[in-house]
Amino acid sequence: MTIIRKKHPLIKIINHAFIDLPAPSNISSWWNFGSLLGLCLIIQILTGLFLAMHYTSDTATAFSSVTHICRDVNYGWLIRYMHANGASMFFICLFLHVGRGIYYGSYNMIETWNMGIMLLFAVMATAFMGYVLPWGQMSFWGATVITNLLSAIPYIGTTLVEWIWGGFSVDKATLTRFFAFHFILPFIIVAMVLVHLLFLHETGSNNPSGLNSDADKIPFHPYYTIKDLLGALLLLMGLMILVLFFPDILGDPDNYTPANPLNTPPHIKPEWYFLFAYAILRSIPNKLGGVLALILSILVLALMPFLHTSKQQGLTFRPITQTMYWILVADLLILTWIGGQPVEYPFIMIGQVASIAYFTIIVILMPIAGMIENIILDLE
């Protein structure tokens, strides 16, 4: 068996990635989220595949087909809610994974980090298009509002929007192409994940101490395979509690009303995992400015390797930057809350302050804190 594992051209790749991989001996549970994201992706692709077997991407029948899945297909309700809530679990793991990367300075592995940012964009695009497919009120109006943002691009904006819509409004052509993209993107994401792993295995994993762990490595299997299995069980337990007891807690009631272009819902808002970005978008009065801020809210992560001023990698022994980090986390929670609130006083003001704070902490305060800590710890 050992010979096959180490010699076979295909199995050898799996062996080097998941079995004989030298891993740091001290990586904590924060390093579990990579494998959990892999599990989420598998769940989403499988449930999505079974949903696609019964779904019809036509404005006349899309809403009915989703109802049909929930009522008439064997365990269709289970598949549908696993897919919908699986997306939420996916984003929870994504945010924790990125948060871990920021906390422990993993962004210094630039190729892996940039690939991760591209993955984040791809997953967000996929989730957005998936939300349009049930063709409820929030699906339709969410698609209308978000695609309409592209009209802010000078000169080509309006043409671009009509090209994406396939007409002069969100209609049958839009739904069909969104279904096509929503189906193909996860497979592109799988390919990107493999590249992400390829880059990671060039450098090896970071660890909580932020020190080089070459002198103290252990094999990935059995130590981390069993640890990942425990994480997977906890994730599945959380997902199934959500699916079986509170399937609609994260959804919008408006999406149980079929799409109606003549009736605008009082509060148009995306799924909870986009609310922080939506709040940043809304906090800028200018349309193009809002769109740029929206893109920058994620793209600012790409600047982190260049804003790293500290002589230490992680925040483990850096109390000032640690404080900044947790203020940033609180700020993101505030933005998420604001994104779901109506556009009125005092929410507008809170959103603007929180948006400014978000960029200020990342671009200005954390690098300054790093420099101060170098001086305090006499590392200059």
Curated annotation (Swiss-Prot):
Binds 2 heme b groups non-covalently. Heme b b562 binds at residues 83, 182. One of its GO terms (molecular function) is ubiquinol-cytochrome-c reductase activity. CDD domains: cytochrome_b_C, Cytochrome_b_N. A ubiquinone binds at residue 201. InterPro entries: Cyt_b/b6_C, Cyt_b/b6_C_sf, Cyt_b/b6_N, Cytb/b6-like_sf, Cytochrome_b, Cytochrome_b_C_euk/bac, Cytochrome_b_N_euk/bac, Di-haem_cyt_TM. It holds the Pfam family Cytochrom_B_C. Heme b b566 binds at residues 97, 196. GO terms for cellular component: mitochondrial inner membrane; respiratory chain complex III. It comes from the Eukaryota. The chain crosses the membrane at residues 33-53, 77-98, 113-133, 178-198, 226-246, 288-308, 320-340, 347-367. Its main location: mitochondrion. Keywords: Electron transport, Heme, Iron, Membrane, Metal-binding, Mitochondrion, Mitochondrion inner membrane, Respiratory chain, Transmembrane, Transmembrane helix, Transport, Ubiquinone. Its cofactor is heme b. It is found in: Mitochondrion inner membrane. It is a multi-pass membrane protein. Component of the ubiquinol-cytochrome c reductase complex (complex III or cytochrome b-c1 complex) that is part of the mitochondrial respiratory chain. The b-c1 complex mediates electron transfer from ubiquinol to cytochrome c. Contributes to the generation of a proton gradient across the mitochondrial membrane that is then used for ATP synthesis. The cytochrome bc1 complex contains 11 subunits: 3 respiratory subunits (MT-CYB, CYC1 and UQCRFS1), 2 core proteins (UQCRC1 and UQCRC2) and 6 low-molecular weight proteins (UQCRH/QCR6, UQCRB/QCR7, UQCRQ/QCR8, UQCR10/QCR9, UQCR11/QCR10 and a cleavage product of UQCRFS1). This cytochrome bc1 complex then forms a dimer. Belongs to the cytochrome b family. Heme 1 (or BL or b562) is low-potential and absorbs at about 562 nm, and heme 2 (or BH or b566) is high-potential and absorbs at about 566 nm. This is Cytochrome b.
